Amino acid sequence: VIARREERLEQLRKEVNVPLRIFAGDLQKKHVYRQFYTELCQWHPNIRMLVNAAGFGKSGTFSEIAEKGKRIHTDMIDLNCTALIRITQMTLPYMKMGSRIINMASAAAFCPQPSFAVYAASKACVLSFSRALGQELREKSIYVTAVCPGPVETEFFEVSGELKNPLKKLNMAAANKVVH
């Protein structure tokens, strides 16, 4: 499991009943991929499940977001799409028959989202990649699933700036309900 916050990784390890290898690192930092790849080469693990859930979104028109920061759009694509593809590429050689890849997409993948354009496009990428990869890996019995939830109660909406209307919170699913 790769995540930015080591304390959350340790908490996750305590909560699950399966062995986990944890790796603290920010997938927006290039050196993390080299470190992760080096560790994979040393461990030669049998990866039974890969869950790609890293990502973020920013709310606002394309122009408004671009004015806030020149790299916000490309950072979003890098984390939501490129990181997912790179981690999948690195771990796939260590996956055998019956392994699973679960990619977190979003209901936003299914239609354009004004004021959330790049986020929706990035999740459409995740969905399309997952469908195609699933077809490619079918003969190896490695299963790929794209999970496309609607709004989920996480830190996502604080970071995105999307939750300006408190009524939107009424439609949110609890994160543990989506996972189980």
Language-model segments: which ranges?
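Conserved glycine-rich Rossmann-like NAD(P)H-binding loop of the short-chain dehydrogenase/reductase
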Residues: 1-11
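SDR active-site lid
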Residues: 128, 134-180
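Conserved mid-core segment of classical short-chain dehydrogenase/reductases
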Residues: 34, 41, 45, 55-74, ...
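Active-site helix of classical SDR
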Residues: 88, 122
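Active-site loop-to-helix junction immediately N-terminal to the catalytic Tyr of the SDR YXXXK motif
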Residues: 112-120, 132
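Residue(s) in the substrate-gating loop at a strand-loop-helix junction
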Residues: 106
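Rossmann-fold cofactor-recognition segment
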Residues: 16-31
